[in-house]
């Protein structure tokens, strides 16, 4: 007792006053935070046991949701630096509690992350943020925020290749080798559609429902999760009828959850993977919240551990890059279309769009299991349903080829999608070029796909308008950057170049004086055993122009790019190709630096294809033939009217300004120049490399 009295004499005055609150207030505090008193008793010993860190300015950063109504102030995810040891995570949390107590504040550590990322979840006053940001090992702190379910049988026919279509949907493989984790509401697991196919885990991390009169009817609480489980693996209305599922409850009966709850759910999956490794694993996240750095980082960690993550793009008729986890590059992000392959409209809102969307899938009036009874069905709409379709397709593809990486799976999903079927007028004008015109479909066959050259186009975020502003587009870790281009709506840009960053090539685009910003466009391909390099020629300064070659005989040209250090009155003349004579060279303006992407890989061969027009038009295109894949796209000759060149599926598109306002002449005709590549059969390629 004497020892306890001694410790009490050390308590800060504000804490002492807090403990002397009236009985009603004390009981309320005890009900809400039952272990606070135990924490207070330990604070003094914590202070004695922890050496004070030297005072220093905060180098960590603070982040919070851009949408104020979704913010949850008072709860924060403290993310520690990458190299932080497990013991240091717990020590940092204790240090925060001890230093907060000295200032008269109570804190509560809600969760310590170890397996997903180093850090912890803490309940504390926002007044302590400055203190927390100065703690050793802290990388950044993010305020918790809300996430929401994204839902407001033509669908099975739409995703099935014609050769499999019949009176009944019968996929080639049911996804029996794959396990799908669903982060959603609770599930009615005894529904006939999913009975025996879904295991409801004991994981639950949800906020309280809003409103004191909310009644938690089972049918309401289970509605969203039950429907999506049926879409993924239902006996009658499911995509991957053989896939097994595990459900984690991260959304409450109103379809609302938190970023922190989702993080803890993802860590639960990671722990399960570590304890009992299984075959291919797909995680379906049919939810969306405001942009979250920590949620995107967690998705990256899980993806690099071999997990395929599929998420809803969101139902806000907005740029998907403003939401998480939709904006995470490692996640397969899915928008929603209707039976006519058009974007889904949900009242005044609808599917999200933009460069962060990978593809679209059926998401309107989708028939699935209803939680009203064990034999009931209901139709629901939204990007949640679209994501469930892609999760089912992914499960089936992984069941056939379980060794597929995330990059290989994504490339196959894109390659086998239905193309150019969506009416782009539905999207805002500035988003049409960025949004993929792809609707998911099952591959007709995987035979021979291993030697197919798969490529996709990755757009960067739009740069700022300053002269020195740049934009960077990156490929996935398992992909090769084969070419780099740029696009500016004003036409004022200083070009682009491929450069090394963090051991990987990236595509960097440069804005010009008076420009409105620029986008970088990377052509990212799967090219196993590739040896690629970038050859650069500085400005020639005189003569016909600057030119650069792929010097090695076994290397082929996959892309050309150029950039200017100094503006030429805001114009840009990108590199051109001379297919006659020396096809392995890029030729550009004499005042520009020219870059050639040169690669060697088994069976790789490339050729140049050009399509010109006698007078300027707003757009000119050239496409690679069947069996060839577009790797590079540029403009010829590249006058000041050219806005940029970019790849859309297997077509090179060159855009120019509205010719009615530019006073163009026939001397300013332009052409689209494509580099088309393919990989020949293994036996033939092996002979050539010997």
From Swiss-Prot:
Residues annotated as domain Peptidase S8: 153-459
Record EC number: 3.4.21.-
Catalytic EC class: hydrolase
Protein name in UniProt: Proprotein convertase subtilisin/kexin type 9
GO cellular component: cell surface; cytoplasm; early endosome; endoplasmic reticulum; extracellular space; Golgi apparatus; late endosome; lysosome
Propeptide residues according to the Swiss-Prot or TrEMBL record: 29-150
Function: Crucial player in the regulation of plasma cholesterol homeostasis. Binds to low-density lipid receptor family members: low density lipoprotein receptor (LDLR), very low density lipoprotein receptor (VLDLR), apolipoprotein E receptor (LRP1/APOER) and apolipoprotein receptor 2 (LRP8/APOER2), and promotes their degradation in intracellular acidic compartments. Acts via a non-proteolytic mechanism to enhance the degradation of the hepatic LDLR through a clathrin LDLRAP1/ARH-mediated pathway.
Gene Ontology BP annotations: apoptotic process; cholesterol metabolic process; low-density lipoprotein particle receptor catabolic process; proteolysis; regulation of neuron apoptotic process
Cofactor: Ca(2+)
UniProt keyword list: Apoptosis, Autocatalytic cleavage, Calcium, Cholesterol metabolism, Cytoplasm, Disulfide bond, Endoplasmic reticulum, Endosome, Glycoprotein, Golgi apparatus, Hydrolase, Lipid metabolism, Lysosome, Phosphoprotein, Protease, Secreted, Serine protease, Signal, Steroid metabolism, Sterol metabolism, Sulfation, Zymogen
Phosphoserine carried by residues: 45, 686
CDD domains: PCSK9_C-CRD (cd16839), Peptidases_S8_PCSK9_ProteinaseK_like (cd04077)
Disulfide bonding pattern of the chain: 221-253, 321-356, 455-525, 475-524, 484-507, 532-599, 550-598, 560-586, 606-677, 624-676, 633-652
Glycosylation positions in this chain: 531
Protein localization: Cytoplasm; Secreted; Endosome; Lysosome
Signal peptide: 1-28
InterPro entries: PCSK9_C1, PCSK9_C2, PCSK9_C3, PCSK9_ProteinaseK-like, Peptidase_S8/S53_dom, Peptidase_S8/S53_dom_sf, Peptidase_S8_subtilisin-like, Peptidase_S8_subtilisin-rel
PROSITE patterns: SUBTILASE
Coiled coil (residue ranges): none
GO molecular function annotation: apolipoprotein binding; low-density lipoprotein particle binding; serine-type endopeptidase activity; very-low-density lipoprotein particle binding
PANTHER family assigned to the protein according to its UniProt record, in alphabetical order: PEPTIDASE S8 (PTHR43806), PROPROTEIN CONVERTASE SUBTILISIN_KEXIN TYPE 9 (PTHR43806:SF60)
Gene: PCSK9
Subunit structure: Monomer. Can self-associate to form dimers and higher multimers which may have increased LDLR degrading activity. The precursor protein but not the mature protein may form multimers. Interacts with APOB, VLDLR, LRP8/APOER2 and BACE1. The full-length immature form (pro-PCSK9) interacts with SCNN1A, SCNN1B and SCNN1G. The pro-PCSK9 form (via C-terminal domain) interacts with LDLR. Interacts (via the C-terminal domain) with ANXA2 (via repeat Annexin 1); the interaction inhibits the degradation of LDLR.
